[in-house]
């Protein structure tokens, strides 16, 4: 690894540690020329599928966009940030497991709705009302009936 201070190519690894999550390796290094120390991090690089929007355009998958939409749906609801992050991790796991290069925005939306339904029924209804573009009260009532039916079964 090239030293960021003097540019010398030879460095020595002094210490290596794994992050608690197990997805990052931290290495403490020392330059053999100038003797200065620096830290490097190694992370797994994941390639999410491109998201194909309804108009046919393609955009990169954006975790923050998913997180923001979930946080908006769950605003003032008793759902922790950790629970949202775990839900997003499950969504991303499903996106990666398909191994496809592209995925429709509708499929991403359905994955978000499934996770919101697990987390909080009110958040699910809020998201569904915007995502499915309800035109009238009957469509809203259908989703309410669906949620009520799942609560009765439990």
Curated annotation (Swiss-Prot):
Cofactor(s) required, per the database record: Zn(2+)
Q: Which GO terms describe its biological process?
A: negative regulation of DNA-templated transcription
Please indicate if the UniProt record lists Manganese as a keyword. Answer: no
Positions of disulphide bridges: none
Recorded hits in InterPro entries, A to Z, give: ATP-cone_dom, NrdR-like_N, RNR_NrdR-like
| Note describing how the cofactor binds | Binds 1 zinc ion.
Zinc finger regions (unnamed), where? 3-34
A molecular function (GO) held by this record is: DNA binding
The residues covered by the ATP-cone domain are: 49-139
Keyword entries, A-Z: ATP-binding, DNA-binding, Metal-binding, Nucleotide-binding, Repressor, Transcription, Transcription regulation, Zinc, Zinc-finger
Give the similarity note. Belongs to the NrdR family.
What role is this protein assigned?
Answer: Negatively regulates transcription of bacterial ribonucleotide reductase nrd genes and operons by binding to NrdR-boxes.
HAMAP family on file: NrdR
Protein name in UniProt:
Transcriptional repressor NrdR
Mind giving the lineage of the organism this protein is from? Bacteria, Pseudomonadati, Pseudomonadota, Betaproteobacteria, Burkholderiales
Name the gene for this chain: nrdR
